[in-house]
């Protein structure tokens, strides 16, 4: 039986939130919207609706999120109840970010800055090269770090650069506290530590949910990162609300049956 699904994911997310009094951030590093036929048929609406219902805080733009073009993803971003982030995917003519570059939020008295960064291969998505450019990730993130200085206690980068790109980013910009990565499809049972930057990544196709517990010391530094791999297998019960949402989209896009010849 296949793994994954938004209904199982929602069950685990609810459980995590119910068992802790600590702030919980729900984040996604991209390549999220078009991995399944239903997502393609709905132009990503089913995934955006599900993520909004689950209370996601932010996601980054990955190459596959642009599979239907920039305009479709912009439309989904307007519908989402969370920001879709990329600081370095810019309008080809004005050199301004196409999507929101970062988000600021506060949980439990802690100020978080969330910054999205997209891989150069995003230009290979249909029609993207005609309207957009991808700026150098390190230089662009560095520019925004200067802008965010003093506005946050914890700086998190949602990165679709891949593991090696994440490591290069951490080496160049040690002020980054945490990188939540995508693209490389790694299931990281333990975080990668580069200097003082914590790097994590959790698989592909929504088959796993990654949990990373961290402690903030008196100086606001991330300490003692503990990673948990949560497999969304058939033993995980479906959340009723998310199952109903997914089923409603399945019914809408179901192929009509062919009447037998008489």
Feature locations, PLM:
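Acidic, metal/ion-coordinating pockets
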Residues: 1-262
């Amino acid at each position: 039986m296949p793994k994954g699904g938004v209904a199982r994911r929602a069950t685990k997310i609810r459980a995590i939130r119910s068992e802790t009094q600590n702030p919980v951030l729900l984040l996604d590093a991209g390549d999220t919207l078009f991995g399944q036929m239903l997502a393609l048929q709905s132009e990503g609406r089913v995934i955006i609706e599900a993520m909004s219902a689950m209370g996601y805080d932010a996601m980054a733009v990955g190459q596959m999120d642009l599979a239907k073009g920039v305009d479709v993803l912009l439309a989904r971003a307007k519908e989402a109840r969370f920001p879709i982030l990329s600081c370095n995917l810019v309008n080809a003519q004005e050199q301004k970010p196409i999507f929101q570059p970062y988000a600021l939020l506060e949980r439990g008295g802690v100020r978080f800055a969330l910054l999205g960064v997209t891989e150069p291969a995003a230009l290979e998505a249909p029609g993207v090269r005609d309207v957009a450019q991808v700026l150098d990730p390190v230089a662009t993130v560095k520019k925004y770090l200067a802008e965010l200085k003093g506005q946050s206690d914890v700086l998190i980068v949602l990165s679709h650069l891949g593991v090696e790109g994440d490591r290069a980013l951490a080496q160049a910009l040690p002020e980054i506290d945490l990188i939540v990565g995508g693209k490389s499809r790694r299931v990281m049972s333990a975080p990668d530590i580069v200097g003082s930057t914590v790097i994590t990544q959790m698989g592909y196709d929504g088959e796993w949910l990654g949990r990373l517990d961290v402690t903030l010391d008196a100086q606001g530094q991330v300490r003692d990162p503990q990673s948990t791999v949560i497999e969304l297998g058939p033993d995980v019960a479906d959340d009723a609300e998310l199952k109903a949402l997914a089923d409603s989209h399945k019914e809408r896009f179901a192929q009509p049956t062919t009447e037998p010849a008489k």
